[in-house]
């Protein structure tokens, strides 16, 4: 009887500690849990896309995109700006850089600009020194060796979603600018767009209407991965990917970035066989396929359509005044 009483007394003291340790272990494991589905499921129409290769998990891990892991970045930091270009786009890129400097010159709200080198020569990089030294522009080289060889085909734009994902590991929000994007005028208040985006359920905003449907400029094979019904794709306008705003929220990582990066990694998702950039539009730019493909832009539009339950008002910026305009050299 005495031994039994001693045992029960010890158990009464030990059990709470044991439960605490078990709960802490389970909690720790749950926080690290990064289970991932490898095929996109369209819940509205009960359609499942072609599965991506699980080989890409290591890269997803490196970009914090493997599952439901929570972002540790402070949301209080203002969005920074990110761009990327090769030497053949340096001329238009210098206009973009100058417009960025001019726009923020008289503003108290200073912002960081990171430029990714995706094919600059030594001389090209020297030409950027002016912006690095005087305006704090940061220049990074994109590490192509971490990714499949076909990333080096710059016209397939696989590098764009990966660069955006890389930077969103460090910063809570980013503006993406193509090298051809320049600020339209100094009176535009980007903070209005940032506030609007931060209030969305999936905090990604596209800004420029392309005046044709997603269907018209998306290779049919991409729909195998992101199962949007053809009739829906014909009614949805494609929005340009030349300037976009992203917040590093869990919903953005799960619903958009993870799949966008997977598409970039999967050879025939981002660039289906026989895909071509040049379009042959008919007078009806919504209901007829223009025999072309917009690569990263097609993918982000499909993903945003799916994430918003096919309501572009959730991600297409509603105000008419342009934030940037595109001027290609």
Mark where each language-model region is.
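Glycosyltransferase catalytic domains, chiefly GT-A lineage
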Residues: 2-329
């Amino acid at each position: 009887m005495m031994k039994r009483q001693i045992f029960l007394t010890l158990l009464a003291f030990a059990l709470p500690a044991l439960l605490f340790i078990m709960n802490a272990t389970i909690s720790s494991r749950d926080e690290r849990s990064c289970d991932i589905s490898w095929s996109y499921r369209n819940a509205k129409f009960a359609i499942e896309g072609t599965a991506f290769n699980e080989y890409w998990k290591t890269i997803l891990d490196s970009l914090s995109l493997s599952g439901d892991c929570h972002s540790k970045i402070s949301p209080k930091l203002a969005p920074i700006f990110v761009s990327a270009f090769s030497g053949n786009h340096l001329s238009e890129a210098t206009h973009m850089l100058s417009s960025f400097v001019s726009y923020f010159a008289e503003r108290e709200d200073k912002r960081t600009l990171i430029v990714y080198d995706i094919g600059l020569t030594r001389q090209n990089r020297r030409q950027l020194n002016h912006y690095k030294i005087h305006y704090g522009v940061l220049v990074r080289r994109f590490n192509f060796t971490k990714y499949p060889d076909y990333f080096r085909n710059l016209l397939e734009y696989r590098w764009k979603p990966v660069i955006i994902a890389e930077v969103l590991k460090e910063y809570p929000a980013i503006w993406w600018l193509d090298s051809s994007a320049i600020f339209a005028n100094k009176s535009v208040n980007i903070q209005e767009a940032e506030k609007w985006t931060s209030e969305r359920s999936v905090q990604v905003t596209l800004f420029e209407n392309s005046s044709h449907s997603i269907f018209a400029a998306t290779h049919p094979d991409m729909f195998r991965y992101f199962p949007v019904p053809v009739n829906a794709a014909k009614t949805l306008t494609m929005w340009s990917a030349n300037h976009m705003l992203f917040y590093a929220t869990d919903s953005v990582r799960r619903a958009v970035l993870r799949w966008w990066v997977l598409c970039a990694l999967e050879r025939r998702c981002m660039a289906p066989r026989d895909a071509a950039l040049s379009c042959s539009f008919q007078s009806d730019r919504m209901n007829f396929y223009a025999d072309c493909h917009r690569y990263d832009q097609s993918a982000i539009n499909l993903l945003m359509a799916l994430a918003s339950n096919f309501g572009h008002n959730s991600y297409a910026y509603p105000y008419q005044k342009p934030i940037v305009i595109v001027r290609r050299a």
